[in-house]
From Swiss-Prot:
Gene assigned in the entry: hspB
Alphabetical keyword list: Stress response
Database matches in InterPro entries: A-crystallin/Hsp20_dom, ACD_IbpA/B, HSP20-like_chaperone
Family: Belongs to the small heat shock protein (HSP20) family.
CDD domains in the record: ACD_IbpA-B_like
One GO CC term on file: cytoplasm
Name listed for the protein in its UniProt record: Small heat shock protein HspB
Domain sHSP: 30-140
């Protein structure tokens, strides 16, 4: 038996901790969330990522991928063309919906489907205005400094 807690009264009295409470809420829901189909999230390089989902038994036209704002959604629904009689069914064909929260400036570049494995390529593209840049320092250099010799009166 699982106990759920209502943090709403606590949230009303705090300002600036929205992200922290989102993480607590996400951790609480993680146990109740369906983790089908299994997936891997890989970092291919500094700014390239790949999500791989094991969707055996589905075809490419039975899967829909949508990216809306910062959420990537993968949905699958098996279309049964004919009734078959299984003696044992180990390959799942139930409908699914997986959502991935994307970080800022992460874009979906493409997807491929091969041998029951759906691979989604992601790239992080930070705008030029947001990238750090080096600022040169101008001013007098050491060669322009003159030393004045003299006695103070």
């Amino acid at each position: 038996m699982r106990t759920t807690y209502d943090f709403a009264p606590l949230w009303r009295s705090t300002i600036g901790f929205d992200r922290l409470f989102d993480l607590v809420d996400a951790a609480q829901q993680a146990g109740t969330e369906d983790n089908y189909p299994p997936c891997n999230v890989e970092r291919l390089s500094e700014d390239r990522y790949q999500i791989s989902l094991a969707v055996a038994g589905f075809s490419a036209d039975e899967i829909a991928i949508t990216a809306e704002q910062s959420v990537l959604t993968v949905e699958g629904r098996k279309s049964e063309k004919q009734q078959r009689e299984f003696l044992y069914q180990g390959i799942s064909s139930r409908p699914f919906k997986r959502q991935f929260n994307l970080a800022d400036y992460v874009q979906v570049k493409g997807a491929s489907f091969d041998n029951g494995l759906l691979q989604i390529e992601l790239v992080r593209e930070i705008p030029e205005a947001m990238k750090p840049r080096r600022i040169s320092i101008s001013g007098s250099s050491a060669s322009n400094v003159r030393q004045i010799d003299g006695k103070a009166a």
